[in-house]
Amino acid sequence: MDTEKVEKARNGNVDEIGNLLMENMKSMYRVAFSILKTEEEISDAISNTTVIVFEKMHTLKNAEFFKTWLIRILINECNKIHR
């Protein structure tokens, strides 16, 4: 993961946040699919995660852990939907 990109995103660069999300979309889909199974639920989980990342990007403490942080948010959203 390119920490420079993450730092730009953390400092409010909306385009960079979008780029980071697109770079991780396959991983996000695989994780969501392993928990939810239906396309509608997967789409909802990824959409919810995207909104949260845009709102909370400034709270990421360590740029090196962006992907871990992103996937954890996604798993939490999947679990909310799965309940």
Identify the function of each model-found stretch.
Residues V14, M25, E39, M57-A63, ...:
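A short, glycine- and basic residue-enriched loop/turn
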